[in-house]
Every structure is written in structure tokens, then in C-alpha cells.
Curated annotation (Swiss-Prot):
Cytoplasmic side: 85-91, 195-205, 283-284, 376-377, 445-470, 549-888
Record's GO cellular component terms: endoplasmic reticulum membrane; plasma membrane
Name recorded for this polypeptide: Phosphatidylethanolamine N-methyltransferase
Compartment annotation: Endoplasmic reticulum membrane
Amino acid sequence: MTFTINNTNSTVFDSTNNENMTISEPVQPVSKGPKGITFSGETFIVPETHDMVKTLFDPTVKKSNFELIILSCLFSNLLVFLISNNQIRIYIFIALYIFWRLSYNFGIGWLLQNQSNHNLLVSWSQKYHLFDPENKGALAQSIQNEIKSQRGENYDIKSMPVEFNTWLIFRKFVDLILMSDFITFCCVVFCSAIKDDYQFINNQSSWLVYSRIVLGSGLILFNLWVKVNAHNTIKDYAWYWGDFFFRQINNEELIFDGVFEMVPHPMYSVGYVGYYGFALIAKSYVVLAIAIFGHFLQMIFLHYIENPHIDKIYGPSKNEINLIKILKLKDLKNFDNLKPLVGLTNFNWMRASDIVNLVLSLTYGIIIPLFANSIKSLFILTVGMKLFESISINLSLTLQSYFKIVTKWSLSNDIPVEKSFSNWAVLYNSLINLTYSSLFGMNLGYFLQKSGSDSPSSGLLFSDWFYLRVFLGLLLIYTQFWINFSIIDSIGYFGWFYGDFFIPKSQSSIKNITTAGVYRYLNNPEQIFGVCGVMGIFLIYPTVENFVCVGLWVVNNFIRINFIEKSHMVKLYGEQEVNRDSGVTKTVKKHLLPEVIQRRMSNDEAYTRINGTTHGRRRRSSNLHRNSVADSLDNFIRDLRNSSTKLSQQKLIELSQNLSFANSDYKLTIDGLKMQSTESDELKYTTIGTPVTVSWTSPTENHSVRDWIGLYKIVQTSYSRNKTILSSAGRWTWCKEPKGSFIFDKEKLFWEEGVYEFRYHLDGKHDVAYISEPFEIKSIELKVPEFKEDAIKFAENLKLEIFDKVIKLTDISEAISPIANQSDNVIEVYKLISSMISKSTKINITYKIFLNQGDDDLLSIKDVAIKLINIKHVLEELSYNITDKKDV
């Protein structure tokens, strides 16, 4: 059944997919009811119709000729019960069910496919003039009589389009096949349940029997609610595939309301859970098998018949399809324009990382289990791998979210963010592969060791219902695969590998949180379904080891989604955007919660939006604990950022200034130092690379030409105030005259931040005569501008404050490398410049930024300035203020 939406606000019919359609005048007077239009452009008023249950089983509704035939066919199934052998009855009903199921999926499917592609059924009607009153043929007369018996004697067949009349006849074939399919299935259920003296209530404990019946009945009732809700939503038009024959004006879009907002294709997915409820009540693997058989054929019907027609009628236009293709190709630019490895999908023999993943997966999944001595060792390996993966991935994402460690490291080494993200994707996928390979290997080892023993079921927590466990386990494993690929289809590889943590929104094709695909129905589909495959493995092999692994997988998944991923998404897109109701939540609120509770929840949410936090963030009661934990983490990180371990300035002064020098005849004064503030205990300072002039005075009678001054770090000399036992490493000068001065610059300076002092030494020895006041060498603060238009001014500041202190360039456009290559050690020069830039701008870069210049080696100061602006732009887009979380 297809499903459409009634868009009452639309007044223009969208014929994007039917370019040749023209609209003619209605063929009958306008009356109440929806307006239809055929694919040839003929418009008409669609008369009211009834569903098959009301049509066939409501005694107040007059039955048509075909409907009487259908009822006769349905009741004829009772003749089978005249056979006394119940097993033969089961075989007969199974054969009948298979016949009707094949008639449904392949018979109706073939008719619908040809109607969609070739207008086959309508062409037949026109070819044989089935609705022409002048046609006196037996077939035409019987079909016309059938329509009149449906619509009444006053129904004017000729006034209605052939398409609509053909649809009315097609409906009766659908009624016959669908009702016969369901009735024969119910007969199989009944016969299977009562065989062997009502086996469905025997040979089991009472609690288990009641549990089966209650759970099975619940599935059946839920199935019934799905069908009723679906029919109330899409009406007869879509229930009977009306859009294969004509269109209803203002029904140009797919509907996502009611149960259609809860799960994708509910008529084909959860619309069959009742079949499994019947199997549970009947306690029959036969019923389970034919339920799986019928459901499988229905999914084939959906894939090959329903979906192609939906895409044809309601799908995107050619331009939209091309746009989608382009976006998917853009998604691959982060992965060298190749689909990245996900598990072992998209494997490429030409990628070294793929080969390594394959080797590791085979090693941990097959080779190690073949040679392992015990299951315990495999269990320890699996737990160890999962803990390693959980801690490393969660810690990496947390640090990237708050501190951008991966991005900063990459940009500092002049590595594009796309490349760093690609490397992260390889690491992430490799660790995930190792965990699942280890889990598979543990269970393979268990199978190999137990299969040869006398009691293969020993060690299992339970060993009953093996085939049921295998079916449910494989179903859960398949569900995880399906969910994972659905997630990738919705958010791309960018979203799958947490691209929001690494790539700024301006450089990504994803600007907002998606609500398409599987995310239309669930906000976090991977919350449960992302690990349900591990639960499936536990069902197949219910060992203690697998139970522990399920716990590890679930806990890690919960922490990663709720405390890392969701926290980052809230700060990036806003809490209201992230916490919007999913389709399932909307459906539960609308259809399954009492109205009084709905009003209360609506009032609570409205109150919270108005009287919530100072930032206007919406909170829900179920999120209070999680938010409080997340806020505690934020507070901890904020305190960590704001904390410092600097020694007090007064303590530094006490360490530096030896009071015994207060009345000394020797003096040292430092010229050109700057004051940090007006407070007396604040150290004077200079900036890195700025020459420092020191003046000395010594008594003439005691002066020696071998007196000398050295520059030292206080933290290295504070333990010895009267004698220096540390080398000055070349940062010294002779004091040949009793009075004089000397400029410390270039190699005689420390090119790093810290607190320093000058020491006056006597007669070429290390005896200290005087220690200067302490002073601080600190980085100049340079603000990186927001826009590239300010790059020239910023480059001038870089040249003045940093480059001119190391190398001499004539202007900001001159190439750096030719001048730097003239130095004795060009790498050290680059390291020094990059260090000064990093400290001055608070943007970390490494010397490699000067090496990745291309073939022309024309990197200039202006180019460096532009690179810094770009890096700042990337980091700011990925960052947020912890104390002021973003809200939308």
C-alpha cells in the first residue's frame, strides 16, 4: 500500500514527474469529495469507498456480486475441517497460504508493476471496452454489473474515467487475495495450536504458557492498531494502490503522520508483528516459518514493486536527484574521494589501511581462536579490546570536543583538517573492527571447543528453544547491520565518523541535524539498535562471557551517545534542535497517551521554555540527571582551563633578590623593561626576542677586567644565591670597565617565556657579587583577525614583532626560505619562529608549516598570516564557550 499526504493548503497540482500531464475540465458536476486526476489529465470527483472489512463483513452494507464470491471462497476454507487428520489439514492450509501469498506478492505485484510502467490494466479496459454500455459481451456486462452492484443502479459508468472504474474492479481482486491469504494463515495457526491434544497449552509451565499468550496477544493487538491507524491515515485511495491508476489533487507528497511517523513502511515492517504473535501463541515452528516466509516475500514486494513506484510518483525531481548525488560525492572529499572502510564494507585492495584491517580482523576473529588454549583467554582478549576501544575513542572524542586536540595538532603541522579526519576515520574503524573480531573469535573458540565435547550445551545460561534463539539472534544481527547502513544513508560517512567533531560546518555539506531517513523515526537509532547484534550473539550463545560483553557494549554505547555525542551536538546545534521529538515519541504522545497527560506534558514544556534556565534552554524531567552530570563535567573542564600553577610574584622576588646585596657597592640595572601594572609587586617584563640592555657599576679599586655578567633562569639558580654553579650557555659578557653597559640579543637571549635575572660575577669565577631585579620574558600578544581583508595589517605586525627579531625580510611579500636558508641551522630558525607565533597568537603551529611550501618556495609572511586566519576560522567554528552553551 502506498501512502500520501492530504495537503489542503496546496492549490496547484505538482506534475514534476508527469511532464506531459494536462488538466481538462471535470467530466461531472462538482460535489463534495476529493478531486482526482488521471495520468491523461482528466479530472473528476472521487466517490466515497469503504475498506474491505466493512465491505465484506458489515451486514448493513449491501454486497456486490464479486463480494459474494469472495465470501463464498473464504467460507469454503471450512470444508477442509471435514478432514479428520489434523496434520493433513495443516499441509492443505499451508499449500493454500503459499498459493495466496504468491498470488499477492507476484500476482498483484506483476499487475501493479505493469500498470505503473505500461498502464496495463487501464489499457486492457480500453482495449476490450469493458466500461462501454454498448458492449454486450459477457465479460463487459459482468464487470459493469459488478460496478453497479458496488455503486448502485444510478451510478453512471461512462461519466467516470476508465482509470477509476478499473481501480474499482482491481480492488475486488485485492480483497479476494488478501483476505484468503490471512484466513488460510489463521487456519494454519489454529490447526498447529490444537494438534497433539492442544499442544500450545501443554508441556510447559503455567507461567510460560500465560506469558506466551499475553505477549502474543499484545503483538496481535499492536498489529491491529497499526493496520487501523494506517488505514485511517491513508484511506482507501492509498490502501488499494490508487496512485497506480490516478492521482488525488493536493496529495503530491508522502505522508508522515500517525504510524507512518513511527516506523518506515509500517504496513510491511511492524504491520507483520502479529504473525509472530500468532506463532508465539501457537508454539509452532511451522507457523513461525510461514510467518517469516510471508514477511520475506512482502519485503521483496516492497523493494521491487512499491518503492520504485513511490520514487516515480513522489520521488525527487531530476535536479534534486543530481543534487543528492553531488552531495554524496562531496561527502567523499574527506576520504580522498573514495568510500571509506566501514567494518569491511567498501574494501579496497589498493588501500594499505584496508589490508591491515583485513589482516587484523582475520587474526583476531579466526587465527587466534584456532590456536587458543581456553575460552578464558579469548574472553580476556575481547574484554581488553573493548575497554581499550571504549576508553581511547571516548577520551579522544571528549578531548576533541572540548580542546580540539586533533584539529590543533593537524593544523599546527600544516595538515588539512580533511586529512586529519580521514586518519581519525581509519583509527575509529580499526578499533571497532578489532572489538567485533575479538567477539566473533571468542564465540568461534567456544564453538570449536564445545562441538567436540560430550556436552556441547554446558556453560550456557539456558539451552531451550535453540531454533527460536537462532532466528531472533540472526534477526538482531541483521537489524544492527540495517540500522548502521540506514544511518550512513541518512547522514553520510561524515556523520558516521563524527565529522561534526572535526570539520567546521562551513567546510561540510551538512549544516543542520538531519530528520530524514531513519532519523525521521528515532533521534538516536544507534542507542539500542547500534548494539543489538551483540544481543543477538548472546541469544545464540547465552554464555556468561557473552552476557558480560553485552553489558560492556551497552554501557559504552550509552555513555558515548548521551554524554559525549549528544553533549557536543547540543553545544553545536542547540538543545531544542537536538531534543526535538522523534516520530516514535510524537506517535506515542498523540495516539497512546491519555489526553490529560498530553496536555500536562505540553504545559510543562511550555513552562520550561518560558521559565527555564537563564539561556532559555528547554529541559525535560527525564533529562535532568543526565544534564546535571554533563554540567558537572563542563564545570570541571572550565575549572581546569582557568586553573594555574604559577608561583606568586612576591615569592619570585624573594627567591631572586638576596637581601645581603642591599648595601653592596656593585649594582646592575636593566633598561627598557615594561611595567605590567601599577602594583609594586608586579614583575617588569620584556618580550621574546627583544634586546635587553644591562648596565653595571662596580667599585674601581676592586674591579677586575675578568668580572662578568650572566643571564639565568631563576628556577634554575634560586637554590644558590652566593655562587652560580650552572653554566650560562654562552649568555654572558665581560665587564672590562668599572662602569658600562651591554646589549643582550640574538643567541645571548633566552627565546622562551620565564622569569630571569642577571648575575655579576667576580674575577672570572662564579662567586656572585650582585643579582639584578627579576624580570619576565613573555610572548607578545597578537590578535589574529577574523577576516582575510585584514591579513596585510596582521602580516605587518608579525614581521615587526616576530620575524624581524629572527631574520631580516624587506617586506611581507618576500619569500621566507631564501633568507632563512642563509642561517647556520634553518630548521632551528623555523622552530623558533613557529614557537613565537604559537605563543603570541595562541594558535599552535609547527615548523613544518614553512616546509610545506610547494615547488616554488614562495611562502611569505603574508601567506603565513592568511594561514593563521584560516586556522582560527576552523577552530572557532568547532569551538564553543563552555560557560555559555549555544541554544537555538
